[in-house]
Amino acid sequence: MLWVDKYRPKTLDKVTVHDQVAQNLKKLVAEQDCPHLLFYGPSGSGKKTLVMALIKQMFGAGADKVKMENKTWKIDTGSRNIEIELAMLSSAHHVEMNPSDAGFQDRYVVQEVIKEMAKNRPIDAKGKRAFKVLVLNEVDKLSREAQHSLRRTMEKYSASCRLILCCNSSSKVTEAVRSRCLNVRVNAPSEDQIVQVLEFIGKKENLQLPFGFAARIAAQSNRNLRRAILFFETCKVQQYPFTSNQVAPPLDWEQYVSEIAADIMKEQSPKRLFAVRQKFYELLVNCIPPESILKKLLAELLKKLDSDLKHEICHWAAHYEHKMRLGSKAIFHLEAFVAKFMSIYKEFLVSTFG
């Protein structure tokens, strides 16, 4: 078992990084009137850990008995019948899934899942909670139609179903959905908190950590706790005892994006743009999210840029990221950003050096 799963807090009492949020969630459960919830915060901040600990607090050990299945939904859209297959985790008390995986058909999935859960409402025999919990991940990636559908169904079936929504950015969730949930902000842990977690894991695994080793991993993780723990375990597998100057190796795709940035800085031409496009295709084929590619590419380019250009380049990166979210072909927008960058940078070089 990976350390990131082995040392994940299983109950709200054991949560240390977001202890105040955990205590507030405990109060909600104690009052037995838990509303719909929207957890939002950066990747690796601990949203999923809090959600699973909350479900266990609500339903006890039964929530741990989880099975994974690929379920096929047969849906009548009115004009035709469609079949959608999605992976889902479920226990007797909750279902967890990612409806955005269904693409443009996500709204049908949202409607059908909530309807089915409402039909299979648990019997309130011994004062137990007579509702099931539906955990929806990456709600910010749902289409507008799916979010409107979500708002209607969460109102209709609120007596038998509670929704826990997770996303990285609440600004991409419609106001209608946000206003019907209790919003829970989960901040990225500080580097000091990450160091404490790494030292705790090191102690449990009987590892000797050189001075400053945990701090270097924390700095390298960009305040992503999940990534920091994975880096820590990677270092252990690669070399133990640890050395005083040991660092975690960069992720392969991040190294590849760094090489793309270097290529762009060396030459600005249609030939180089075509070569960069081929490299983008390789990243996308290997399921690297286009938003992550653009963000990493921007960070690498900014390291090499004159300060006079940074504001303009950030503006265009934001512009093409927005376009990318509205469109369906990410490669067009990644290539357009690189073309725009090449144009701006070439003009800057000509005006500066002639």
Curated annotation (Swiss-Prot):
Protein's GO biological process: DNA repair; DNA-templated DNA replication
Record has Ribonucleoprotein as a keyword: no
The entry's keywords: ATP-binding, DNA replication, Nucleotide-binding, Nucleus
SUPFAM superfamilies: P-loop containing nucleoside triphosphate hydrolases (SSF52540), post-AAA+ oligomerization domain-like (SSF48019)
The keyword Nucleotide-binding is assigned to this record: yes
Molecular function via GO: ATP binding; ATP hydrolysis activity; DNA binding
Free-text tissue specificity from the UniProt record: Expressed in roots, leaves, shoot apical meristem (SAM), flag leaves and panicles.
Alphabetized CDD domains for the sequence: AAA
Any GO CC annotation of this UniProt entry: nucleus
Gene3D superfamilies: 1.10.8.60, 1.20.272.10, P-loop containing nucleotide triphosphate hydrolases
Induction (record text): Down-regulated by sucrose starvation.
Subcellular location: Nucleus
Binding-site residues for ATP, renumbered to this chain: 40-47
Primary site of residence: nucleus
Residues making up the signal peptide according to the UniProt record: none
Family designation: Belongs to the activator 1 small subunits family.
Assembly mode: Heterotetramer of subunits RFC2, RFC3, RFC4 and RFC5 that can form a complex with RFC1.
Function comment: May be involved in DNA replication and thus regulate cell proliferation.
Protein name as catalogued: Replication factor C subunit 5
Organism, as annotated: Oryza sativa subsp. japonica
Gene it is expressed from: RFC5
